[in-house]
């Protein structure tokens, strides 16, 4: 049987869906449960779980520290997750993938520009409708209109430019390391999932990952 390897994104440990699936009440409890399963899978089945260093590792540790996780959990992360920097200079990516990424990025930029233009028109229209000289002054109108428009703009702009694509170095490192190791990608991220498929990588949803490892362990225990 081929050795099983997994490459973890931060969301493999921190995602709220993971906590819910494990019945945990907080990130500290769910992280400890996941790390305990990972450690058993490593010792009993030689299943290795990797994390890109230092991008994703620092992101994960920073999140756990901000959530007040106890030091024992950090130690488990350091012990059972294999930290490795992707060999960015040696990993070969088909040029078609790069072409698709640039094309996708260009389309998102254009969409973001259209959203920006629409937001300007909406702001001007709202200001015109709301402004009543006898009732409101200029600052009141601007504050009322801009706060609403800016909030709507942020949501639409974020979705247009970041939803379903790679928008950070840690995201890319997860895919590069998984390709280098021929490992399955573990995440709850639409962009990582989409580009993992394009690269021909195995993908495991973060909320399913602990139960997949547990299934391996249960089968091993029946031998």
UniProtKB/Swiss-Prot annotation:
Stated family: Belongs to the HARP family.
UniProt entry keywords in alphabetical sequence: Endonuclease, Hydrolase, Nuclease, tRNA processing
Protein name (Swiss-Prot/TrEMBL): RNA-free ribonuclease P
GO molecular function, one term: ribonuclease P activity
Coiled-coil annotated residue ranges, if any: none
Matches recorded under Pfam families: PIN_5
Record-level GO BP terms: tRNA 5'-leader removal
Keyword Nuclease included in the entry's annotation: yes
Paired cysteines (S-S): none
Signal peptide: none
């Amino acid at each position: 049987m081929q050795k099983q390897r997994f490459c973890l994104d931060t969301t493999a440990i921190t995602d709220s869906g993971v906590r819910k699936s494990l019945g945990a009440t907080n990130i500290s409890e769910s992280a400890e449960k996941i790390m305990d399963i990972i450690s058993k899978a490593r010792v009993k089945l030689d299943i290795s779980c990797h994390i890109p260093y230092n991008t994703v590792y620092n992101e994960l540790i920073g999140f756990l520290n901000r959530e007040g996780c106890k030091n024992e959990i950090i130690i488990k992360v350091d012990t059972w997750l294999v930290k490795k920097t992707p060999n960015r200079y040696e990993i070969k990516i088909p040029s078609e993938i790069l072409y698709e990424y640039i094309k996708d990025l260009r389309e998102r930029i254009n969409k973001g520009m259209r959203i920006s233009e629409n937001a300007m028109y909406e702001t001007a229209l709202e200001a015109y409708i709301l402004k009543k000289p006898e009732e409101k002054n200029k600052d009141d109108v601007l504050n009322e209109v801009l706060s609403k428009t800016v909030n709507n703009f942020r949501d639409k702009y974020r979705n247009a430019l970041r939803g379903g694509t790679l928008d950070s170095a840690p995201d890319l490192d997860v895919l590069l390391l998984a390709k280098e190791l021929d490992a399955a990608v573990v995440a709850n991220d639409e962009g990582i999932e989409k580009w993992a498929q394009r690269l021909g990588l195995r993908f495991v949803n973060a909320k399913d990952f602990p139960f997949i490892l547990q299934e391996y362990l249960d089968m091993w225990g029946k031998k």
